[in-house]
Amino acid sequence: MSVTVKRIIDNTVIVPKLPANEDPVEYPADYFRKSKEIPLYINTTKSLSDLRGYVYQGLKSGNVSIIHVNSYLYGALKDIRGKLDKDWSSFGINIGKAGDTIGIFDLVSLKGLDGVLPDGVSDASRTRADDKWLPLYLLGLYRVGRTQMPEYRKKLMDGLTNQCKMINEQFEPLVPEGRDIFDVWGNDSNYTKIVAAVDMFFHMFKKHECASFRYGTIVSRFKDCAALATFGHLCKITGMSTEDVTTWILNREVADEMVQMMLPGQEIDKADSYMPYLIDFGLSSKSPYSSVKNPAFHFWGQLTALLLRSTRARNARQPDDIEYTSLTTAGLLYAYAVGSSADLAQQFCVGDSKYTPDDSTGGLTTNAPPQGRDVVEWLGWFEDQNRKPTPDMMQYAKRAVMSLQGLREKTIGKYAKSEFDK
């Protein structure tokens, strides 16, 4: 139902609108309704021996071609196989049947890459033994290149070096410290598809001898799905089911975003689906599950988790331009309800020694909060408090944040500290 807005002085009718400055979200199921394949464009005109030298020397000189990287990764990884112990399908695509032996690139459709292959510097000293660690190194640089925080970047690079040394004790990093030639590789769609295919394959074959290649690719799984991760984290930190957590959504914006994320048919809860790789496989250019597209849900969920003493939530990004006041109150009420009650019940017994609760106890005083986690009871109580946080609620929040130190700007932790520790 449309609402008519009129100017009082002359009854002029206007239709208020905002500019459409954001692209709509794209769902993975919609991609597969239009196409039944994920194309991967690779130049296969050069031998694996040549490509191995091109990549090795290119990394050392700081002038490696991403086309060489992709072609080498394909050549080095295409013979890796795994035997399925169950049927594997996703979005109507039959990847393989139980008993089939499949490879990494059975997850995509290989296409020839047109154009001239860039020149490279050969290196006859490189051997097939390099193929045991060089793909790991190239894929690991994807993970390193995704972060710009110097300390964390160094930690990841050190971890990658250690992974490679476990395969080759004489390994030395090929990219000098401080050089960031690989940061832009994530902009190449063929490279990211290889990353996604590798991770999806080894997620299925977790015990494969080459599963350590996931060191760098694991960040491809659920990329740009931070709000979905927030939902999962909130369920864990509260100990409540997905259904019960959902009943605690008290803001229209959060509800709208929850509906957006829970659109049926997207295989969110299917572990071996293409869905977790919707970004790197190119299934979506705007994830329906990102914190950018679900800022209110992300803020509410992470703030609630923080007030329940989650260490992970302190560094969650604080979104811009959301309705902080109502979202903060909703998060505080939810955290206070969970933090003020313990979901305890006897789980086992010896013989018939079972505790039976006494329901005949007297009622609560007018201002006493409910003892359980039922949102209906808590909303009724909150109405009696004139829909404003009580002093005890504010004290609860202050205790949750008062010990937080070293908080980064524009994080949930920083926001909560300034809001409650006054």
UniProtKB/Swiss-Prot annotation:
**Can the keyword Nucleus be found in this entry's annotation?**
no
- Keyword set includes Transcription regulation: no
Q: Which GO terms describe its cellular component?
A: helical viral capsid; host cell cytoplasm; ribonucleoprotein complex; viral nucleocapsid
Q: Where in the cell is it found?
A: Virion; Host cytoplasm
Q: Which UniProt keywords apply?
A: Capsid protein, Helical capsid protein, Host cytoplasm, Ribonucleoprotein, RNA-binding, Viral nucleoprotein, Virion
Which residues does the record give as RNA binding sites? R143, Y152, K206, R214, K286, R317, R408
**Lineage: superkingdom:** Viruses
Gene Ontology molecular function terms on file: RNA binding
Q: Which Pfam families match?
A: Rhabdo_ncap (PF00945)
Q: Which parts of the sequence are annotated with region: Interaction with the phosphoprotein?
A: 350-390
How does the annotation summarize its subunit structure? Homomultimerizes to form the nucleocapsid. Binds to viral genomic RNA; this interaction contributes to the virion assembly. N in the nucleocapsid interacts (via C-terminus) with the P protein (via C-terminus); this interaction allows to package the L polymerase in the virion and positions the polymerase on the template, since P acts as a bridge between N and L. N(0) interacts with the P protein; this interaction prevents the uncontrolled aggregation of N(0). Interacts with the matrix protein (inner layer); this interaction contributes to the virion assembly. Interacts with the L polymerase.
Q: What the protein does?
A: Encapsidates the genome in a ratio of one N per nine ribonucleotides, protecting it from nucleases. The encapsidated genomic RNA is termed the NC and serves as template for transcription and replication. The nucleocapsid is bullet-shaped with the tip containing 8 turns of a conical spiral before reaching the helical cylindrical trunk. Nucleocapsid assembly is concomitant with replication, therefore viral replication depends on the intracellular concentration of free N, termed N(0). All replicative products are resistant to nucleases.
Q: Which family does it belong to?
A: Belongs to the vesiculovirus nucleocapsid protein family.
Question: What's the name of the protein?
Answer: Nucleoprotein
Q: Which gene encodes it?
A: N
